[in-house]
């Protein structure tokens, strides 16, 4: 509407002051105030992807972002679109909800990202359709458990390394929960595990009967009564280790209240408490039963192995996650036991010498039958009792078998989650090790490079820099291109000096060409030549273009070029193939030099009578500093000039 007003308003103002008569030019049509209609098409641009829908489609849900007036904050007046910088793939499912009224959860998308999109558009997760609701809840539960495990692992010290200024409590807690962080923590881990095993074994061995003493050889007694001092010292040492571990864990715990309420803390207390109670309780007949009961609690020390066994922890997590299924199983078994015990009692009530004396006495038979154990100490004798006993056995199989797949699936899920977490941690360790190795290798290579003279200090004061004395990357690329040209064409490029790619060192090759030119002569130490590719030893035979004879490269003519001196003008011969840096380009090297190349071309056929022989230049045998390049034919023995000079542009 503002655009229409801006169109006709200047005409009206000009006519009012007499600048422009209204009759000279027709006015544009006056803007019409359009009432908002439900059949208006709205364009929604989500990260560049345009979606079109009816306005009344979005108005179905006025409590959401797209159905309320809040979407006007995202309106772009220039394009006439509602722009949202969100995921367009997710928005497709959101828009389908406005169209159909059913919200579907995409399987290929992250469940957390899907929840974030729903929260942005003002949609609640309860709107997910029944077809996707179960899968949505399972994925959300699995994701929440994984995030909780990652948070616990990070708190336990399995995450990134602690900062340098970490406190003693943090280091102790990390050592207890993740023993592989240091050698001392690993030693303490194995020591506590050893004493747990010793304590459990001693608790078992002290009940074994031993031979009598020399004074009473016929009297048998347990090993605990035969050697009380040894077992007491062993138990004392184990309890002291367990007490010290518990106190250190309590001191280092991030939240002491949470640690005291944890299951492992209760196991630790139950494992060490009977020992201290036995020290202060006198051994007499009045409290002997209570003392024996306290000694029974020592067997709970075996649960301390759960800290050292990953499988036991997985089993505990499985039972915790299957609490509802286990509760259903217990409730079903309780109902079935009560029902069948009552039926069996009244079915066997009329018989003499029956073992089903009461309904609680029949509980034992029902439990043994439903769990398919069948000890045989209690059996029905009547026909009705046998029939109901068979029904009890079959119902027990069904009741117990139904929750088992759920428990197994939860165990498998938790186990695979743990395996993936271990794999991620192992991969992270490998990546960190590779990064450290790469850094170490790079540092060593740099130091070796500097030691070999590859770098030198230039400048003084704050402007001191490292100047690379090796050849530039441009020149190395040029050498590689020369080698590729030699492989692709029939020409051979040869340099008289060797070039070391490792440190950019130039060394004399000590090789001479068959050519008699200047470039084929041995060069002194001050020469500016360097080589890229050495001359190949095996020279294959080729067939000439205008000849029927097959000759080798040994009989081919060589076109030699002169070496370009330092800061010399651009040559007009084939030596322009050599790396020639631009004069205005400041390369990171000490010197600018050119490389002389020897290009071998096939020998043309012998001169026919029609062709005219060019005259030999003066001093034809020399290869001195003449700019003209000579062509020699070993078969003719007469030097001749090349009719035209081949020019190749420099790289």
From Swiss-Prot:
The keyword Signal does not apply. Residues 474-489 are annotated as: Required for dendritic targeting. InterPro entries: BTB/POZ_dom, Ion_trans_dom, K_chnl_volt-dep_Kv, K_chnl_volt-dep_Kv4, K_chnl_volt-dep_Kv4.1, K_chnl_volt-dep_Kv4_C, Shal-type_N, SKP1/BTB/POZ_sf. Residues 1-183, 253-263, 309-323, 416-651 are cytoplasmic. Glycans are attached at residue 355. Residues 360-371, 372-379 dip into the membrane without crossing it. The keyword DNA repair does not apply. Residues 144-164, 566-585, 601-651 are annotated as: Disordered. Residues 2-20 are annotated as: Interaction with KCNIP1, KCNIP2, and other family members. The modification Phosphoserine is found at residues 458, 555. GO terms for molecular function: A-type (transient outward) potassium channel activity; metal ion binding. Pfam families: BTB_2 (PF02214), DUF3399 (PF11879), Ion_trans (PF00520), Shal-type (PF11601). Residues 626-637 have a biased composition (Polar residues). SUPFAM superfamilies: POZ domain, Voltage-gated potassium channels. Its main location: membrane. Keywords: Cell membrane, Glycoprotein, Ion channel, Ion transport, Membrane, Metal-binding, Phosphoprotein, Potassium, Potassium channel, Potassium transport, Transmembrane, Transmembrane helix, Transport, Voltage-gated channel, Zinc. One of its GO terms (biological process) is protein homooligomerization. Zn(2+) binds at residues 104, 131-132. It comes from the Eukaryota. A-type voltage-gated potassium channel that mediates transmembrane potassium transport in excitable membranes in the brain. Mediates A-type current I(SA) in suprachiasmatic nucleus (SCN) neurons. Exhibits a low-threshold A-type current with a hyperpolarized steady-state inactivation midpoint and the recovery process was steeply voltage-dependent, with recovery being markedly faster at more negative potentials. May regulates repetitive firing rates in the suprachiasmatic nucleus (SCN) neurons and circadian rhythms in neuronal excitability and behavior. This is A-type voltage-gated potassium channel KCND1.
């Amino acid at each position: 509407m503002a655009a229409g007003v801006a169109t006709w308003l200047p005409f009206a103002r000009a006519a009012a002051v007499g600048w422009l008569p209204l009759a000279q030019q027709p006015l544009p049509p006056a803007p019409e105030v359009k009432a908002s209609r439900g059949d208006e098409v709205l364009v929604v641009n989500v990260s560049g992807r345009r979606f079109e829908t009816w306005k009344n489609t979005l108005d179905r849900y006025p409590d959401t972002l797209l159905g309320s007036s809040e979407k006007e904050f995202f309106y772009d007046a220039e394009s006439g679109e509602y722009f949202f910088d969100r995921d367009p793939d997710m928005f497709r499912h959101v828009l389908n909800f406005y169209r159909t009224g059913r919200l579907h959860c995409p399987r290929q998308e992250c469940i957390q990202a899907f929840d974030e999109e729903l929260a942005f558009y003002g949609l609640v997760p309860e709107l997910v359709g029944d077809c996707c609701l179960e899968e949505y809840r399972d994925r959300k539960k699995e994701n929440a458990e994984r995030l909780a495990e990652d948070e616990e692992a990070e708190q336990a010290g399995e995450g990134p390394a602690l900062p340098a200024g970490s406190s003693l409590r943090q280091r102790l807690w990390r050592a207890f929960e993740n023993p592989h962080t240091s050698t001392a923590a690993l030693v303490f881990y194995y020591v506590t595990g050893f004493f747990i095993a010793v304590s459990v074994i001693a608790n078992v061995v002290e009940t074994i009967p031993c031979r009598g003493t020399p004074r009473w050889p016929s009297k048998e007694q347990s090993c605990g009564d035969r050697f009380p001092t040894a077992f007491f010292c062993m138990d004392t040492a184990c309890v002291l280790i367990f007490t010290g571990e518990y106190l250190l864990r309590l001191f280092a715990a991030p939240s002491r209240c949470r640690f005291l309420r944890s299951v492992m803390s209760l196991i630790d207390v139950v494992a060490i408490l009977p020992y201290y109670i036995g020290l202060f309780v006198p051994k007499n007949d009045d409290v002997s039963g209570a003392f024996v009961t306290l000694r029974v609690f020592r067997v709970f020390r075996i649960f301390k192995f759960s800290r050292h066994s990953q499988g036991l922890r997985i089993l505990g997590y499985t039972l915790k996650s299957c609490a509802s299924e286990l509760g259903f199983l217990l409730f079903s078994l309780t109902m079935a036991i009560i029902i069948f015990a009552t039926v069996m009692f009244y079915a066997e009530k009329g018989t003499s010498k029956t073992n089903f004396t009461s309904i609680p006495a029949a509980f034992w038979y029902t439990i043994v039958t439903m769990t398919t154990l069948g000890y045989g100490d209690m059996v029905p004798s009547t026909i009705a009792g046998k029939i109901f006993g068979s029904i009890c056995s079959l119902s027990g199989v069904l009741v117990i078998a139904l929750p088992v797949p759920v428990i197994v699936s939860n165990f498998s899920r938790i186990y695979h989650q743990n395996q993936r977490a271990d794999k991620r941690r192992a991969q992270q360790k490998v990546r960190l090790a590779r990064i450290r190795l790469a850094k170490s290798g790079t540092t060593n290579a740099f130091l070796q490079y500097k030691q070999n003279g590859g770098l030198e200090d230039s400048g003084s004061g704050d402007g001191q820099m490292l100047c690379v004395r090796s050849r530039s990357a441009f020149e190395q690329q040029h050498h590689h291109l020369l080698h590729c040209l030699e492989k692709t064409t029939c020409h051979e490029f040869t340099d008289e000096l060797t070039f070391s790619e490792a440190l950019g060192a130039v060394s004399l090759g000590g090789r001479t060409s068959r050519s008699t030119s200047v470039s084929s002569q041995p060069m002194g130490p001050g020469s500016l030549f360097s080589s890229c590719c050495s001359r190949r030893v095996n020279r294959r035979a080729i067939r000439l273009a205008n000849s029927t004879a097959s000759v080798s490269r040994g009989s081919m003519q060589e076109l030699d070029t002169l070496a370009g001196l330092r800061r010399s003008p651009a040559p007009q011969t084939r030596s322009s193939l050599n790396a020639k840096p631009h004069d205005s380009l400041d390369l990171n090297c000490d010197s600018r030099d050119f490389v002389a190349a020897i290009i071998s071309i096939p020998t043309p056929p012998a001169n026919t009578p029609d062709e005219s022989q060019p005259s030999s230049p003066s001093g034809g045998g020399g290869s001195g500093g003449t700019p003209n390049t000579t062509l020699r034919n070993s078969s003719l023995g007469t030097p001749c000039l090349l009719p035209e000079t081949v020019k190749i542009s420099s790289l």
